[in-house]
Design a protein with these regions (language model features):
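Bacterial N-terminal signal peptides
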Residues: 3-15
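Glycan-processing catalytic domains of CAZymes
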Residues: 19-373, 380-411
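Short beta-strand-to-coil "C-cap" segments at the C-terminal boundary of structured domains/repeats
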Residues: 407-414, 560-565
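Extracellular ligand-binding interfaces
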Residues: 454-534, 538, 546-558, 564
Length: 565
């Protein structure tokens, strides 16, 4: 929050508490700073908050304990939760020897109320206050673990004097290690009056996500809804952009600065927040109502997801990472897109795709890795699941300016398993995609088993394939027979083996045999029983070189069967 607004901008929080269990949100936390003033502490005012799809009520200053109780009663009646602002949670309380007793009396007043969500402690502290904040926050967690102790941090554009540290990263590190908060909340207002955006907006998202993941702490973002100081009045697209970029970065709670418009602000800044000074819906109210509604719907899924990576395409913002070629979804390199990847507890994979441009809609063609067999959108409007059309491993999506779409990925990959030991040589490749344990490919690529044939593509000068895990008795076979078709290459093949006595392939354990690289099927017999290092040996692995010295790159060798006799 801005320092000039702090005196009146009392905060809020989000999530739902489990009685005397560590705080965990039951619903995606959506809240605001600066709620109805004391004289508007009415059921009608809180109904307007509820109708805007907020889940947690923020508060404005000047509430007495009785006012807070009245507010909580209204919230409970409407199915809302509320943050408590009370001087007994102030960071200065840590200076008193009896601060634990202060908190005890606070919890006695509010802790058992069904609408209590948490307790506001401080906004935008300097690092020198972290030790005191740690005492207050941890005492609240000890005495009332089911409710959230809330502290909000500065943005990246704060000065070292404001931060109390030379860098923002150290500020986060000290806060998380000393205070041990339940959430990592911050504000960053990127929309400037000159029409530009702060260049460090995404870097701030990166740092918050990174440190939140390091410490296992959920992150919250505070978004701009009030034109003030050097910040412009957001458009609907810019409001959407703030929401979906935050969601893609794994934010587990969103708040708006502000909900209420004070008369002095309206006069000084010439605009309104979400409601006007009389508590009546202003221009942004229906916009926020829709975005909050979408967040509530998507939040049912997002709360259970873990952010695994966030990447960009187009011109990559400062401090961010370009999407790499190994990602499951590939983006057009020239479009300003953002993609966040997630997994749930079962390993199911999700992605949030966002248009980083809040001025223009975009259409994008996504290229999927071969093992991604389906994309299903979780619709923000109603939570319904909508399969997306795929064609040749690609999907086309349209995105509103600043908009995002949440996708669930369906994947199917046949992971190779350790071959089972074999006591016989009889390979016929009759099961599609089953290599029957053959591997160790060298200078051979693209193995395909189809229609009773193993097909391989030449890609180098020393092609061979290996079948290990054999348990052949001594002298079990006297010859190896192979039926194959060779398009090109030298007219000579080789057959190697290993034994229990000599477990490595070597030039003293192989036989050459003549080949016909004419593109026709031929059967070949390799008289292994005549070799002294085959005779009487327990064979453990075999290797087939379908030609020596390689073949024309891209040409094929097809193998019908390999068997021992």
């Amino acid at each position: 929050m801005q320092a000039t607004l702090l005196a009146v901008a009392l905060p809020l929080l989000c999530g739902a508490a489990l009685a005397q269990a560590p705080w965990q949100p039951e619903e995606y936390p959506i809240s605001y700073w600066v709620g109805p003033p004391r004289e508007f502490n009415t059921l009608a005012a809180w109904q307007t908050v509820k109708d805007c799809n907020f889940t947690v009520c923020g508060q404005y200053g000047g509430y007495s304990r009785a006012d807070n109780r009245t507010r909580l009663d209204f919230c409970a009646q409407l199915g809302l939760k509320a943050m408590i602002v009370d001087g007994r949670t102030s960071w200065e309380a840590a200076a008193y020897e009896g601060h634990a007793e202060l908190i005890k009396s606070l919890v006695a007043d509010y802790g058992s109320h069904p609408a209590t969500y948490g307790y506001f402690i401080l906004d935008e502290p300097s690092a020198d206050r972290f030790p005191a904040l740690a005492k207050v926050s941890q005492e609240l967690q000890r005495q009332d673990p089911g409710h959230l102790p809330y502290i909000n941090l500065l943005p990246t554009y704060a000065s070292p004097t404001q931060l109390g540290t030379p860098t923002y990263a150290e500020h986060l590190e000290r806060f998380l290690s000393q205070v041990k908060p339940a959430v990592l909340s911050y504000d960053h207002y990127a929309l400037l009056k000159d029409g530009s955006d702060r260049v460090d907006y995404f870097e701030n998202l990166e740092l918050i996500r990174d440190y939140g993941r390091r410490y296992g702490v959920p992150t919250w973002n505070i978004l701009l809804s009030l034109p003030h100081l050097n910040y412009r009045e957001p458009s609907a697209d810019e409001m959407r952009w703030q929401v979906y970029t935050s969601l893609a970065y794994g934010s587990k709670g969103l708040m708006w600065f502000t909900y209420w418009t004070l008369p002095a602000w309206e006069k000084e800044f010439g605009g309104c927040a979400i409601v006007n000074p009389k508590g009546e819906p202003a221009r942004l109210y229906p916009i926020v109502k829709q975005l909050n509604g979408e967040t509530r719907v998507l939040g049912k899924t997002l709360l259970g997801l873990t952010s695994t990576g966030v990447y960009h395409s187009g011109q990559v913002p400062l401090g961010c990472t370009r999407l790499g070629v190994d990602a499951l979804i590939q983006l057009p390199g020239d479009l300003p897109l953002l993609i966040g990847f997630f997994t749930d507890a079962s390993g199911q994979q999700y992605a949030m795709l966002v248009n980083r441009d809040h001025a223009q809609p975009v259409e994008a063609t996504l290229a999927l890795k071969p093992h991604v067999t389906g994309l299903t959108e979780i619709r923000a409007a109603d939570g319904a699941e909508q399969p997306l059309a795929l064609a040749a491993g690609k999907a086309k999506l349209s995105l509103e300016a600043g908009g995002g779409r949440l996708l669930r990925l369906t994947t199917a990959f046949a992971y190779a398993e350790l071959p089972q030991p074999l006591t016989a040589l009889d390979f016929h490749f009759n099961t599609a995609a089953d290599l029957e344990g053959w591997g160790g490919l060298n200078s051979l690529t693209q193995p395909v088993v189809k229609d009773g044939t193993l097909t391989l593509t030449f890609a180098g000068a020393d092609p061979f394939l290996v079948r290990s895990f054999l348990r052949l008795r001594p002298d079990q076979y006297s010859k190896i027979r192979v039926r194959l078709r060779l398009e090109s290459g030298n007219p000579e093949g080789q057959f190697f083996w290993t034994s229990s006595e000599e477990p490595g392939f070597a030039d003293n354990k192989y036989l050459s045999f003549p080949l016909q690289p004419d593109g026709q099927w031929h059967e070949y017999t390799i008289p292994v029983g005549e070799h002294p290092l085959w005779q009487g040996k327990a064979i453990r692995a075999i290797r087939l070189d379908p030609t020596t010295g390689g073949a024309t790159p891209g040409s094929k060798v097809e193998i019908d069967w390999i068997k021992g006799e």
